[in-house]
Amino acid sequence: MNVVIAIDSFKGSMTSLEAGESASTGIRRIYPDADITIRPLADGGEGTVDALTLGCGGTCTQVCVTGPLGKPVLCSYGILDTGKTAVIEMSGAAGITLLSETERNPLYTTTYGVGEVIRDAIARGCRHFIIGIGGSATNDGGIGMLQALGFDLLDQEGVPVRHGALGLRDLAVISDSHVLPELKECTFRIACDVTNPLCGPQGCSAVFGPQKGADPAMIQQMDQWLSSYAALARKSFPETNPAHAGAGAAGGLGFAFLTFFHATLESGVNIILEETHLSDYIKNADIVITGEGCLDGQTVMGKAPAGVAKIAKEFQKPVLAFSGCVTEDAKACHAAGIDAFFPIVRGAVSLEEAMQTDHAKQNMTDTVEQVFRMLRTFQNTK
C-alpha cells in the first residue's frame, strides 16, 4: 500500500510533521510494510517556513530583529534552492502572538522587523521571496518595513515618521532615493488569502483592527491615514491601487508589497503545494491522508486539506481527513474531494487536555489505526 500523508498543523498542538508521523505510526500498526510518504503542509500562515524548508530540502536560519513594539525578537526563516529563495513568516517579526492582549495597540506596532528580515536575507544572497503575511499585530500600511529597507518616509519637517500607525498620521514624503539597491533584483510572492482592500468598511482597519486592539475612534483615524498614505504613494508610484484585493492584508502590508515591490499576492496553499511538488507524490499513491485542527465549512474555502484533496482527485485518489474536531458544516468537504473525515478526540476531555501535544499525537495514531483496521477488514472480505 502506497500512502501519502499531508496534514496541516494542529495550531497550538501538533506541527504538520508531528501530525504526519503520528498518522504514519497508526498505519504501520496495520500495514507494517506500507510505503508511506509524509509531506509537510501549511496554508501560508503558521508553519509556512517549516513546510517549505522541510518540503524543499532547505535550511533554517535566525536573525534578531525589531519586534512589533520595538523589543528585540528572534525570527526564523528558511532559505531554499541554492540560497536564492527566502521563506519568511511576517508573524515571526510582527505577529500578534508576540504580544499579550494588554500590549496590543496598532497605533504603535510596527512592521520594521519584517524589513530587517528581508534585508538579512538579501545580505545572504537571496533574491526571491515567499512571504506569509498572516497573523499580524500591525496596521501601519507596511511603512515600518519600508523604512528598514531604506525608503525615506518623512513628515513635513523632513524627519522620519515614528513607528506604528501613528507614523501614517504625520507622513508627508515617500522617497525611494536611498532604498537598498538590491531590491531591484528581487521578486516577491506573497502568501495571502485575504481579499480586503486597504480602506473603507471592508478595509484592514475596520475588519481586523479590533482584534489588534483598536477601538472605534482609532479605526476611523487609521482608515483616514491609510487613505492619505495611498494618495501620497500614487504621486510617485502611479500604479498604486488601494482597492486591489488583498491590499488590506496584514494591516496594509499587502498594499506596500503591491505598490513598492510589484509583488504578486497568491493563495498560500497553492504556493505550498506547488513548491513542495505534492502532485508528484500523490499521483502514485493508493490513498491520501490530510487534515487540520478543525474541519469545518471554511475548510473548502482555500484551506490546506481542500488543496490536497483537489490534487488527489485530479489523479482519482481516495482522500481521508483527520482533525481535532469536526463541525456540522464540515459535510461541505465531501464535495471538495474529501471522501471521509474523522475527529481524533477520544472520550470526554477538556480542550486544554485534548490539545496537549502528547495527547493529540496519541489520539491521531489510535484513530488512524482504527480506520486502517477497518480498511483491512473490508479488503479481507473481498
Label the model's feature ranges.
Residues M1-I133, A137-K382:
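N-terminal loops that bind phosphate or other acidic moieties
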